[in-house]
């Protein structure tokens, strides 16, 4: 939300509620740390990929990158997720390539389709972990989001920060977009900066598109084929302008853009009305998993891959591999 990027009269009106939010969260954290509230310790190490702010900071590309890197190094990894946006009431549940994004959420389906990783969804993280460990022999559990879910003990914490928006106006909810104060970053093992300029002790990540994929046929074409071409773009992610800016920076001529709420389900007529049949409709990979059943001929999604420097890659992975004895 733009109002969270600066201070205004609304900010100060909401500030007392932010103070209350912060106090409650601190009391809750204290109770977990003193073991007054129970928390679950997984039999295998747990790595959390999360953030301290609301909205899309790029956690899912980090999870995909991490899973792929670990798989290449022989680590048996599983992923757990809340399954935001899914309608299923059957928890815990394994997500497969045949799972519906409408039922289990768009991000879990995307992660499984990209990596083939064992993945379970549930609001109860313990149930998800137990389901995975009952069916797979795993070395490590990665949790997609859940930094503030202190009912689950963790061994490693990574935080993803939006390198452009950073921490907005610096207030916690509802006056600002923070779930926790930036001082929380002092306690995590890695800070990943998504775009912009990485600050000290942060690892810069860039999200790079290489090709576009047709939703109907699976045809791939270089993203450069769309340079100078008139297109329409949609994005149902935490921060839609990031996707639109990426396309425009590549040279795509966007006639129209439409942002949607994160995890929003799409109606076929809603999207068909946005672009004429001959105009390409570009979307994120996360949106595509919700649109395949009614996709039109000229609809394309643009997958992005997380990229790190060799130095950051080594710095991020070595502590994990050392802990696992790999």
UniProtKB/Swiss-Prot annotation:
One of its GO terms (biological process) is lipopolysaccharide core region biosynthetic process. The keyword Lipid biosynthesis applies. Pfam families: LpxK. ATP binds at residues 53-60. GO terms for cellular component: plasma membrane. It catalyses: a lipid A disaccharide + ATP = a lipid IVA + ADP + H(+). Transfers the gamma-phosphate of ATP to the 4'-position of a tetraacyldisaccharide 1-phosphate intermediate (termed DS-1-P) to form tetraacyldisaccharide 1,4'-bis-phosphate (lipid IVA). Belongs to the LpxK family. This is Tetraacyldisaccharide 4'-kinase. The lineage of its organism: Bacteria, Pseudomonadati, Pseudomonadota, Gammaproteobacteria, Pasteurellales.
């Amino acid at each position: 939300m733009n109002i969270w990027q600066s201070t205004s009269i609304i900010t100060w009106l909401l500030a007392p509620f932010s103070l209350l939010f912060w106090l409650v969260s601190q009391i809750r954290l204290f109770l977990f740390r003193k073991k007054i509230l129970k928390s679950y310790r997984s039999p295998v190490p747990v790595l959390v990929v999360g953030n301290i702010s609301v909205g899309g900071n790029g956690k899912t590309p980090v999870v995909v990158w991490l899973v792929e890197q670990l798989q290449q190094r022989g680590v048996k990894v599983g992923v757990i997720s809340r399954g935001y946006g899914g309608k299923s009431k059957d928890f815990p549940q394994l997500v497969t390539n045949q799972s519906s994004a409408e039922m289990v959420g768009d991000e879990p389906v995307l992660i499984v389709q990209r990596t083939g990783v064992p993945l379970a969804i549930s609001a109860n993280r313990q149930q998800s972990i137990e389901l995975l460990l009952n069916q797979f022999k795993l070395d490590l559990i990665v949790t997609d989001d859940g930094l503030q879910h202190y009912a689950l003990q963790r061994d490693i914490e990574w935080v993803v920060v939006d390198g452009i928006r950073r921490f907005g106006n610096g207030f916690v909810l509802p006056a600002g977009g923070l779930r926790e104060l930036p001082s929380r970053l002092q306690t995590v093992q890695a800070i990943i900066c998504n775009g912009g300029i990485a600050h000290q002790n942060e690892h810069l990540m860039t999200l790079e598109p290489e090709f576009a994929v047709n939703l109907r046929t699976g045809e791939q074409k270089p993203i450069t084929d769309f340079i100078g071409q008139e297109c329409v773009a949609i994005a149902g992610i935490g921060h839609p302008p990031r996707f639109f800016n990426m396309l425009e920076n590549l040279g795509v001529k966007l006639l129209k853009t439409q942002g949607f709420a994160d995890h929003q389900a799409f109606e076929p007529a809603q999207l068909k009305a946005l672009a004429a049949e001959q105009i390409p409709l570009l979307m994120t990979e996360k949106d595509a998993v919700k649109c395949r059943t009614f996709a039109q001929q000229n609809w394309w999604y643009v997958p992005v891959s997380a990229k790190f420097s060799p130095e950051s890659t080594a710095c991020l992975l070595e502590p994990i591999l050392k802990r696992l004895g790999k």
